[in-house]
Amino acid sequence: MSSREIRIATRQSALALWQAEYVKARLEQAHPDLTVTLLPMTSRGDKLLDAPLAKIGGKGLFVKELETALLEGAADIAVHSMKDVPMDFPEGLGLYTICEREDPRDAFVSNTYASLDQLPAGSVVGTSSLRRQAQLLARRPDLQIRFLRGNVNTRLAKLDAGEYDAIILAAAGLIRLGFESRIRSSISVDDSLPAGGQGAVGIECRTADADLHALLAPLHHADTALRVTAERALNKRLNGGCQVPIACYAIREGDQLWLRGLVGQPDGSQLLRAEGRAPLAQAEALGVQVADDLLAQGAEAILAAVYGEAGHP
């Protein structure tokens, strides 16, 4: 078993390749006799760059091709950004490892202004996320939010070309790719609650491959997994994907988890908030509880309108 080859399915973006290389290095460090190779591939979400994610519709935009490689035996594991991973897995696959989380916050990036508060009225801000858009406009309704897709390098290039006064990106991606100096300020989770799983890397593999599960065990970070479990349970209860205005963030407080959740109108006119605390062993139940609080406040109507506009259930 120690001489086994592990084939990693990964997207081809710089950030996805960084994540796959990170997993490769961790595996080789834990198991020096292991041979680890990367299988880069293009996902549907990578091909459809001319429309907002919410308009494209469907879940698993960035993972389906990788899962197909696992099911067909072409790859042994798939490495994902946890915020892109759907709640449900194809039969025969599962999520067995969640690596330690990087900074989960959103980052404010601008060549002119140091923070969101410094932006003049009417400034153009780029983001592809309805979650970020809702929270930005709730705080600053005087801003113009403009569609922004593409990988990290592409988005930074568009900012540098003067298409935007500022852009909002995940801090984790910038840090991992060596662009930490481009972050003018990290936005507090109080002002921009992150997406579920943001900053965490997950490893998916075949459920029947028990030997592989054991090889992956040293990469698993229990605290991150507990937090992400609560966040994903909230998302699942709300039937959310990575392209809807749902935010959630859990932190550990001793022997308890504190989970905050949010559902927002994309125009920022309404933000529904809920939070809860529970023992660590009840992470999943906590996610459902906070989601139910949001549903009781009217979250379903907001999300139904978003899905209806996007043309998918």
Curated annotation (Swiss-Prot):
Keywords: Porphyrin biosynthesis, Transferase. Its cofactor is dipyrromethane. It catalyses: 4 porphobilinogen + H2O = hydroxymethylbilane + 4 NH4(+). It comes from the Bacteria. Gene3D superfamilies: Periplasmic binding protein-like II (3.40.190.10), Porphobilinogen deaminase, C-terminal domain (3.30.160.40). CDD domains: PBP2_EcHMBS_like. Pathway: Porphyrin-containing compound metabolism; protoporphyrin-IX biosynthesis; coproporphyrinogen-III from 5-aminolevulinate: step 2/4. Binds 1 dipyrromethane group covalently. One of its GO terms (biological process) is protoporphyrinogen IX biosynthetic process. GO terms for cellular component: cytoplasm. InterPro entries: HemC (IPR000860), Porphobilin_deaminase_cofac_BS (IPR022419), Porphobilin_deaminase_N (IPR022417), Porphobilinogen_deaminase_C (IPR022418), Porphobilinogen_deaminase_C_sf (IPR036803). GO terms for molecular function: hydroxymethylbilane synthase activity. PROSITE patterns: PORPHOBILINOGEN_DEAM. Its EC number is 2.5.1.61. The modification S-(dipyrrolylmethanemethyl)cysteine is found at C242. The porphobilinogen subunits are added to the dipyrromethane group. Tetrapolymerization of the monopyrrole PBG into the hydroxymethylbilane pre-uroporphyrinogen in several discrete steps. Monomer. NCBIfam families: hemC. Belongs to the HMBS family. This is Porphobilinogen deaminase. The gene is hemC.
